[in-house]
Amino acid sequence: MRTLVLDTSTNLLYISFIENNKVIYEVSSMGLNNHSDHLLPLIEEGLNKHKLTIKDFNKIILGVGPGAYTGLRVSMSVAKMFSWTLNIPLYTISSLDLLSSGYKDNGMYLVKIKAKKGFIYHKAFKIENGFKQVIENDMFVSEDYIEKYSEGTIISNDNILVDSLNINEKELQLVDNVHALEPNYLREC
């Protein structure tokens, strides 16, 4: 079983190849409005390194936002193309879940990914004994919104931590029609 994981919703370009529950290739690269220049060459680099083709993957997981309009379109276009042309099942996940998947310790977590003009993409969740409880689902709010929380680890653009092996299968959504798939732009308060 091989899985391709992609997300370009923020300044972070994330790619992971998972084979039999082991990450065999991973790229976590910060960029500024240049994911379209790097995504396909980095995927190709991983394929060449492991002597694979996209046909060798059984599943694609795509972070669908919320996030930057152009950034979301980059990985979404690639994932949809691979899924449609090669008949590979495509699953979506909130980018906020994916970009915070490396946080596993007990505690409260406040995702605060910078949007524009004083706003953030936010999610609040608590982890207790390995179980994740969502307190507030994906939101587009003012930067000061999370000040209402007296405690919690703030996850921002500076400390995104992805662990593609820690993706909760319950957070995945199978895409029935790749042509109808749209990013989660989340632009309303």
What positions do the PLM features span?
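Oxyanion-binding and handling regions
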Residues: 1-22, 34, 91-189
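N-terminal phosphate-binding loop and adjacent alpha-helix
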Residues: 32-48
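Phosphate/pyrophosphate-binding loops at sites that engage ATP/ADP/AMP, CoA/4′-phosphopantetheine
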Residues: 43-59
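Phosphate-handling active-site elements
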Residues: 50-55, 84-95
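Short glycine-rich phosphate-binding loop at a beta-alpha junction
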Residues: 55-64, 150-158
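DPxDG-like acidic metal-binding loop motif
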Residues: 59-90
